[in-house]
Swiss-Prot record:
The keyword Cell division applies. PANTHER family: SEPTUM SITE-DETERMINING PROTEIN MINC. It holds the Pfam family MinC_N. This is Probable septum site-determining protein MinC. GO terms for biological process: cell morphogenesis; division septum assembly; regulation of cell division; regulation of cell septum assembly. Cell division inhibitor that blocks the formation of polar Z ring septums. Rapidly oscillates between the poles of the cell to destabilize FtsZ filaments that have formed before they mature into polar Z rings. Prevents FtsZ polymerization. The keyword Cell division applies. The lineage of its organism: Bacteria, Pseudomonadati, Pseudomonadota, Gammaproteobacteria, Alteromonadales. SUPFAM superfamilies: Cell-division inhibitor MinC, C-terminal domain (SSF63848). Interacts with MinD and FtsZ. Keywords: Cell cycle, Cell division, Septation. The gene is minC.
Amino acid sequence: MSKPSLELKGASFTLSVLHINSSDLNAVMAELDSKLAQAPQFFLGAPLVVNLSAIQHNDFNLHGLKELLLSRQLVIVGITGATTVLSKQAKDLGLAIVKAGKQSTTPPPAPRQTKIVKQNIRSGQQVYAKNGDLIIFGAVGNGAEVIADGSIHIYGALRGKAMAGAAGDPTAVIIAHSLEAELVSIAGQYWLAENLQQHSSDKSGCIRLNGESLMVESLPL
């Protein structure tokens, strides 16, 4: 019996959600450009779901938003929270209408292994712990990236980018003796440096998910 030429299978993916709070596209793009400048490689080519729940009028320029995002190498794959009229416009533009899924009550499997690095991670270097946690005895410098499918523990300063729960684990955490990061991300939810500064005045801390938002807890390190 010949193998079928295609298969339909269920799968889950972590997508970033861009919340639009203003119909002024110039203001939206100015703020977005500022964030992109802080972490350009993190967003490059990233598929986005656009949340329009804050936009209640139907003359919003959805086509213009799509073109502006494409010009910055960002790709809208769908929208959520839109009015009926804007949802129809989205379909005409070839965009999917995304409905928020229910939170799973089944916890993800625990990471199977731990990767230990006993050195500083310098600018331009990347360390990835697949299917496990990442422990670093050293500093993560500006321009460096550390990624783990599980949690990330840094016994030193975090000045670069740290992405935990890269495979979608919402229970992952990021712990560092000094939180000075350019970007932190857990299961696709991220903070840039400015967000981290707004939420934490202490150097050491633990970053984790609280529902769908990040939070930071002080640690006596």
